[in-house]
Amino acid sequence: LAYISPEAETEKHRAEVGTAYLDFQVGKSQILPDFRNNASELDKINSTIRSVTSDKNITPKGIILKGYASPEGSYASNDRLSDNRVKALRDYIRSKNDFPQSFFTLENEPEDWAGFKAQAEADYDMPARDEVLSIINSDLQPDQKEAKLRALKSGSAFSYVLKNIFPSLRRSEYRIDYTVREFTVEEGREIIKTRPQQLSLSEMFAVANSYETGSKEYNDVFEIAVRMYSSDPVANLNAANISIGKGDYESAKKYLSKAGNSAEAIHARGVIKLIEGDLDGAETLLKQAKEAGVIDAAANLRELQKKRDDNALFDSFNMHN
């Protein structure tokens, strides 16, 4: 089996993300920590920021804040309000941390019609659901849409969304961008146990190769790698090879479906076909892999020929008996 060494990241960019549901007094943008459930929501934000600022391996690079409001009231008013509220959140974070104003990127969604649509589509208990969706999807201006919603079914549909959907649309999404320093193999052996997301794929590969090939530790690292980088072709190929080594061919096929078409991935698919007895399919793939430079392909083609010879001998024996 042929493993691939991943390319090194020139700089390891990572992010912590979250959503806070802060409550504001009607028409106001001041953050009141003791108002309703704000204390626990602010704790979530502070905890996420602390997880970054307290880690000596991390350099914070910036915070993106995006405020969302629900489609209730005039669009112009909601635009002002969501803008002021996201600025208030920035100022609150700055009051707790030594971040310059330039550290922040602010965005706002005055009325979250996309979120409203997604929730309406999923809510089959909503009164006049089809009519509500028709209004949401129309080309009307936001304030005109709201007026039509308020008039629908004598206001029962709007009362429903006001209570059951709009509260969850009013939120602040935050993302803290940071970079992570490089680790030695010895450091990587420890970091992978507690904060694997801080390791690059190439660092994980180096950690894996510091263990005996096929050992539990070796296999564990590749399995962690594919969990952390689930869509990466290299991580999936290496995990597939581990699964083949364990005899877990179904898992190997699942990983190989996301492993791309590198010579090594083609080789691994050929190995599975060889094991499963599809000698013609295996030969096609193994020859492709050999031509593309996979050294192990030649040995597997010899193994394939031995199987063909054994099958021919077996068939010949049966014919004479």
Enumerate the predicted regions with their spans.
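Residue at a conserved register position within TPR or TPR-like alpha-solenoid repeats
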Residues: N209-E212, S243, K273, Q305
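Short coil turns that delineate tetratricopeptide repeat
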Residues: Q198, S230, G260, E291-V294
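Structural motif corresponding to the intra-repeat A-B loop/turn of tetratricopeptide repeats
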Residues: E212-S215, K246, E276, R308
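Periplasmic peptidoglycan-binding/anchoring modules of Gram-negative envelope and division proteins
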Residues: A2-A15, F24, S29-K66, R94, ...
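Periplasmic OmpA-like peptidoglycan-binding domain that tethers envelope proteins to the cell wall
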Residues: S70-Y174, K246, L274
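TPR alpha-solenoid repeat register
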Residues: A235-N236, A265, A297-A299
